[in-house]
Amino acid sequence: MKICRYKNPHLKGLPPRLGVIYNGQIIDPHLNFVAEYEREGLFNPWERAEVKCPSSLSKILSLYEKPFETIEEGFAIALFNEKIGELETTQGVPLFYPLDSDTSPITSPLDSIHSFRDFFCYEGHAKKAFKGSIPKEWYQGPTYFRQSHQNFIGHKDTIFWPSLTKKLDFEAELGVVIGLEGRNIKEHNAKNHIFGFTIINDISARDIQKKEWP
């Protein structure tokens, strides 16, 4: 399942929302719960849907030990709504949006990031960096940089070039999103704490970096 956040053109003034990418479109799980509750005639369908499946991915991760179950339920409701031709709420808000559209653009995947660690490199990369001789300390624990968790931007957003650098570089990296909190996690239990994976462009000022870390 591919999860994203997107800007909803019909809910202006509200933050980007949780979406599921499927079959060339963005499905909004929260809105599909709204449509389901409206169909059932339940009171306060929008509020009920926000409790069941929040429009914020970070909120879902903080509330549920198994967040995928809630998202998958909303996805299943969306497929049913599409099958019966129910494509919007009673207020006229669509349940489905075109992918890669200027009207409903994808943003950064998480709305609230509490901690970001940029790990040094893979073993193969480390061998090249240390010219074949990796220090034993490298194997004793993960080596990482403490990065700012407030400087994430989204798909197709503009990367601003700081005036202090003349050598701005980027690296495509694998991002691991932690869903379930923990401490002193054993290797065989690690996957239970991983919510998903994403692709990150790590932007570096190489000339500044060289001065700070020769």
Map each language-model feature to its residues.
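N-terminal non-catalytic cap/leader segment that marks the start of a structured domain
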Residues: 1-142
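Glycine-enriched loop-and-adjacent helix/strand subsegments that border the catalytic/binding cleft
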Residues: 105-214
